[in-house]
Amino acid sequence: MKASILSKLESLVERYEEVQHLLGDPTVIGDQNKFRALSKEYSQLEEITQCFQAYQQAKEDLVAAEEMAQEDDAEMREMAQDEIKAAKAAIERLTDELQILLLPKDPNDDRNCFLEIRAGAGGDEAGIFAGDLFRMYSRFAEKKGWRIEVMSSSEAEHGGYKEMIAKVNGDGAYGTLKFESGGHRVQRVPATEAQGRIHTSACTVAVMPEIPEAEIPEIKASDLKIDTFRSSGAGGQHVNTTDSAIRITHLPTGIVVECQDERSQHKNKAKAMSVLAARIAQAEESKRAAEISDTRRNLLGSGDRSDRIRTYNYPQGRVSDHRINLTVYRLTEVMEGDMQSLIDPVIHEHQADQLAALADQN
């Protein structure tokens, strides 16, 4: 391992011990904001500290085993060779783990996120598939102990949704789901298909981090066009007799957000503004990323329908991720929310790309 990396790790361990000491300080315990911030830092440093300590122990084990290999006793020398092999394997594994733990963290990864699903090409079947995707993500969220909150929805005529915007509340929601952005294609025989022909339809998914209230940039009132209208669809008689639905247009960017799920116009406006802030921030981030993009691939989808990331093939029971050439024959389980086998390989590939980029810089 490079001396610069070892030095960085040693300084992180020092900081971990310092934070550990501070958390026992009565003045810190009495300051809830400071205590909360230090507790978060402590938990972030704990994993890398434990990993580095295990790495140091493996190095010590290797030295001890190499010394044992010099013994006169043949049985001891044979035992030492096994220990040398085990220590070297541990050092290699822990080195890889430490490099990943040292990768720059996306500050948004720990945040809640907005999940937008839109029916694309494929008519009624695309709307039904949008409903299937929302159910899949909802089941996955349940397994993670997260909470799904519908922000806005537009139901399709024959089931499912034309559009669904939901907020996913939970630690690490954005970091886990951010690679879901892009085009999702389904191949299956629709229930209404008498000839048994396979149809292809598509949906687009966009995942955006929630912007905390304190960090929302000021949006000028003059930049907004706010329309109220009567809610359509589910919600009961009361909803349909008042202009409770809200449509907000951000004039400088042309971004439009509608919200009609709440009975209260005030609540609909608050929800729409939070989605609008996330969309504006995402548009700015996409622009920044495009300006500094290089020849490296970007596994983070754009949410554009042309950016196809995954195919769900029902006749073959398979799901394929086109970004990393991954195919799993577990379609039923995936649609029931068992998505980790699809999510983890993309995250690992992204980390490998980050490591390659760092290697090029050094």
Swiss-Prot record:
Family, per entry: Belongs to the prokaryotic/mitochondrial release factor family.
Coiled coil feature spans: none
Name of the protein in its database record: Peptide chain release factor 1
Matching PANTHER family: LD18447P
Xref: NCBIfam families: prfA (TIGR00019), PRK00591.1 (NF001859)
Domain of life: Bacteria
Keywords of the record: Cytoplasm, Methylation, Protein biosynthesis
Residues where N5-methylglutamine is found: Q237
Gene source species: Vibrio cholerae serotype O1 (strain ATCC 39315 / El Tor Inaba N16961)
Pfam families reported in the protein's UniProt record: PCRF, RF-1
Gene3D superfamilies: 3.30.160.20, 3.30.70.1660, 6.10.140.1950
Functional description taken from the UniProt entry: Peptide chain release factor 1 directs the termination of translation in response to the peptide chain termination codons UAG and UAA.
Recorded GO MF terms: translation release factor activity, codon specific
Main location: cytoplasm
GO CC terms: cytoplasm
Gene: prfA
Subcellular location, record wording: Cytoplasm
Region (Disordered): 289-308
Post-translational modification: Methylated by PrmC. Methylation increases the termination efficiency of RF1.
